[in-house]
Amino acid sequence: MPVLADEGFEGPTKEVFQTPHWFDVGIGSVNLYLNKATALTIFAALFVGVIFWLGFRRAKIIPRGLQNLCESAYDFIDLQIARGVIGEKGTRYTPYLLVLFSFVLICNVLAVVPGAQFPATSRIAVPMVLALVTYVLFNYAGIKANGAGPYFKEMIDPAPTAPLWIRVLLAPIEILSTLIVRPFTLAVRLFANMFAGHILLLVFSLGADYLLPKPPYVFGAASLLVAIILTAFELVIDALQAYIITILTAAYIGGAMVHGEHEVAPSEELASPAPAGVPVSARA
């Protein structure tokens, strides 16, 4: 890289992610603006909404075309993630999980679409908003399933039967994990993966553009080949990151819903009386 820099090669700069404002509008103390990152985020949201609206506006008993695609996506999220992770009660959260998966996937895939070539999720603001919505939702699910008192009580005292010093140690860990670490890691994981992947793709793409016209051409060809391979790999990462954030969201919702449920200990199960007519030897 230093040799290339001395010869005039310029790698990715901060302007790649700090896209210039197309226009600014000041309303009092509020400054509204539109740039490439914001436009792509709005496009992704509208694209997802329009696709599902077109797919279900004239639903038929035997789905075809776009309706078949939308129903397949819904069934996948509902069966594999909502019910598979949360349980039967997870169906009520399927619409949110479906929209989350679809929106993140489109935002990610825009990184390799000509004309866009920018993943909106590589701006930390987008993953932070998604994590905030998930944060509110899984806490709401926990409060609705268990009640506010039991939900926060177990968060403060997750092991009531443990010795006092363990309870004191676990309380801040549980509170930090639920209220701070989960939304933070959810946002940073998506942001960091998309940011790093886009930087890597840009380095080899710009390298190929710089080296191809110059002999020896083998270096330019190698850089171009790596860029093509990374583009294909980026598509896999795009889908994988959308899946990961969706399944983690489902796991957080499911964990919050069972928060505070009492599990029967083996000793309690053995101590319970056997049903009438069952021999004592059959209790074990």
From Swiss-Prot:
Record-level GO cellular component terms: plasma membrane; proton-transporting ATP synthase complex
- Give compartment(s): Cell membrane
Keyword field contains Chloroplast: no
Any idea which UniProt keywords this protein has?
A: ATP synthesis, Cell membrane, CF(0), Hydrogen ion transport, Ion transport, Membrane, Transmembrane, Transmembrane helix, Transport
State one molecular function term (GO): proton-transporting ATP synthase activity, rotational mechanism
- Superkingdom per UniProt: Bacteria
Q: Outline the subunit composition.
A: F-type ATPases have 2 components, CF(1) - the catalytic core - and CF(0) - the membrane proton channel. CF(1) has five subunits: alpha(3), beta(3), gamma(1), delta(1), epsilon(1). CF(0) has three main subunits: a(1), b(2) and c(9-12). The alpha and beta chains form an alternating ring which encloses part of the gamma chain. CF(1) is attached to CF(0) by a central stalk formed by the gamma and epsilon chains, while a peripheral stalk is formed by the delta and b chains.
Similarity field: Belongs to the ATPase A chain family.
Provide the function of this protein. Key component of the proton channel; it plays a direct role in the translocation of protons across the membrane.
Q: What protein name applies here?
A: ATP synthase subunit a
Organism, scientific name: Frankia casuarinae (strain DSM 45818 / CECT 9043 / HFP020203 / CcI3)
